[in-house]
């Protein structure tokens, strides 16, 4: 309750809009019971509670829909009046990540995990699905700089934007780059160092520069069905033989 009171007071002083209804309340009976049940009193937990407290006080435009675990030197930025950064429940953000919503909306689904040193830049719309894993040094952006006019500095020619969607249950490997206009289906694996742009079907494994589909996870799983069945049969027979000899 102290957190909500301080946050509300800060919003009144700054003249900001009312509190977003999606903002979770952390000091509740349920949250205290969770802390007790999980023995969440270690220095690791206490430091993350402290970081979350100051995030809510100093950055009210960052919406946290539930408990969020924040590592060291993390940058969570949403430009007031222009952008919104929404973090789902149980999101883990490792050390030195940078999630920047300059304009538009940057949404992170429940239980997404960020390794370290990842950068997400949003100027229109970026969505990272629930339970998606981002490794280290991943870069995601939904814009490009315009460079058509050779007589005008590139920095003065503006940008072009297209939304980025990374579906749930994806694994984005080390040093992957996801460019504007990309839609990554659920359950995809983006191999290390891949540069991805465009549509990627669900359950695909993508690698290379530019990124291309290397295999279909469903096809691989079904192709190994006979092997799995044979191994299960061996395990059953072994267990049956052991039970018979023991009797």
PLM segments and residue spans:
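Short coil-to-beta microelement around the adenine-binding A-loop and adjacent beta1/P-loop entry
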Residues: 61, 163-164, 182
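Proline-centered turn/helix-capping motifs that create local helix->coil transitions or kinks
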Residues: 140-149
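A short acidic, glycine-rich active-site loop
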Residues: 153-164
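Domain-scale signature associated with acetyltransferase and cell-envelope carbohydrate enzymes
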Residues: 1-141, 167-169, 202, 211-215, ...
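Beta-rich strand-turn-strand
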Residues: 121-125, 174-189, 194-198
